């Protein structure tokens, strides 16, 4: 019977540690977003290189006046706009929803319900915003991957043979299918590796900060205990009064006769 409460206490302690680490991960999500922005920036740079290679098949004079090229360059230069929107729009929307809820008098009820679950409203807000950011960044990356695949197919279709001949050739179609499958495999492997690396760095940072916080709290408790010991000693010494001088009318007690004091 005693083993069941021990198991429950260990499970509750493990769940509490997991919740704390999740909260720390949410608080340190800026590092993950910076890593994703760096990845998107490198991805954009690679796309620029691919477009330059694709445009190298044609004379530069035609490329400069081509409307498709201008649209492509404009889209690449405006790539930072959806990234900024993906990072800022959810926070603005959430702030508007909270303002409307407070205006309608629903804010305190939501805050009380969230605090009953063991986490503050700020933590739940950060969790919601991080989920929205992750979804929007994933959608943006998916759009970029689709666009790059389309550009890759266009680059592969450009050559000496016409497009119809390429489509009718089975060898070319099989090679394109193999290249597509290889590309998707490399892309999925790279994405998983980068995500795992980002989560590993984030979790390591959270664990280090959690350990530092625990060490700081332990040091503060030890310092408080050491400061309390002299105060206790002073209190005990003040409670016991010092022996006063003898009264003036009192006489010293003489030893009785027959005692060893004679």
Swiss-Prot record:
GO terms for cellular component: membrane. The keyword Transmembrane applies. InterPro entries: WBS28 (IPR029166). The keyword Transmembrane applies. It is a multi-pass membrane protein. The chain crosses the membrane at residues 6-26, 30-50, 67-87, 92-112, 127-147. The gene is TMEM270. Keywords: Membrane, Transmembrane, Transmembrane helix. Residues 226-262 are annotated as: Disordered. It comes from the Eukaryota. It is found in: Membrane. This is Transmembrane protein 270. Residues 240-262 have a biased composition (Pro residues).
């Amino acid at each position: 019977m005693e083993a069941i409460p021990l198991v429950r206490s260990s499970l509750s302690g493990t769940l509490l540690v997991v919740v704390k680490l999740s909260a720390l991960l949410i608080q340190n999500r800026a590092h993950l977003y910076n890593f994703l922005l760096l990845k998107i920036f490198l991805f954009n740079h690679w796309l620029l290189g691919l477009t330059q290679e694709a445009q190298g098949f044609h004379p530069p004079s035609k490329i400069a006046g081509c409307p498709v090229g201008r649209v492509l360059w404009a889209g690449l230069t405006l790539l930072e706009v959806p990234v900024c929107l993906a990072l800022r729009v959810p926070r603005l929307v959430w702030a508007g929803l909270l303002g409307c809820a407070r205006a309608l008098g629903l804010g305190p009820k939501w805050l009380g319900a969230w605090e009953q679950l063991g986490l503050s409203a700020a933590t739940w807000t950060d969790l919601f915003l991080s989920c929205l950011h992750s979804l929007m960044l994933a959608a943006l990356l998916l759009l970029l991957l689709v666009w790059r695949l389309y550009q890759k197919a266009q680059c592969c279709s450009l050559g000496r043979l016409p497009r119809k001949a390429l489509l009718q050739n089975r060898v070319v179609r099989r090679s394109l299918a193999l290249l597509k499958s290889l590309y998707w495999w490399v892309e999925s492997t790279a994405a998983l590796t980068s995500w795992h690396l980002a989560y590993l760095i984030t979790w390591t940072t959270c664990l280090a900060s959690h350990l530092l916080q625990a060490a700081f709290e332990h040091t503060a408790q030890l310092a408080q205990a050491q400061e309390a010991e002299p105060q206790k000693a002073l209190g005990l010494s003040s409670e016991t009064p010092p022996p006063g001088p003898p009264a003036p009318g009192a006489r010293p007690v003489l030893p009785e006769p027959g005692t060893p004091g004679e």
